[in-house]
Amino acid sequence: MKLSDMRALSAADFDKEIAARKKELMELRFQAAMGQLAQPHRVKQLKREVAQLNTIRSEQSRAARVAAQTGESQ
């Protein structure tokens, strides 16, 4: 998923996407432990996507807090 697509997600969609990627990551780690991992690069890719989703979610919540604080002070 591209960053522009990630930024367009709603708050509920962030949680769904993160949960889906973490579940897939868990399954891939299990496959790696069993020695049956077909795409080892996918583990790195999923970890990166989870981190990007978490970063975007925190950026958006921080921006919302700042907007609320500036709105109160006016």
UniProtKB/Swiss-Prot annotation:
Give the UniProt record's GO annotations in the biological process aspect: translation
Which UniProt keywords are present, listed alphabetically?
Answer: Ribonucleoprotein, Ribosomal protein
**Record-linked InterPro entries:** Ribosomal_protein_uL29 (IPR050063), Ribosomal_uL29 (IPR001854), Ribosomal_uL29_CS (IPR018254), Ribosomal_uL29_sf (IPR036049)
In its UniProt record, a GO molecular function of this protein is: structural constituent of ribosome
Q: Which residues form a coiled coil?
A: none
PROSITE patterns, per this entry?
RIBOSOMAL_L29
One of the record's GO cellular component terms: cytosolic large ribosomal subunit
Under SUPFAM superfamilies, the record lists: Ribosomal protein L29 (L29p) (SSF46561)
Superkingdom: Bacteria
Pfam families (UniProt xref): Ribosomal_L29
Q: Which family does it belong to?
A: Belongs to the universal ribosomal protein uL29 family.
The molecule here is called Large ribosomal subunit protein uL29
Q: Tell me which species this is from.
A: Deinococcus geothermalis (strain DSM 11300 / CIP 105573 / AG-3a)
Task: List the taxonomic lineage.
Answer: Bacteria, Thermotogati, Deinococcota, Deinococci, Deinococcales
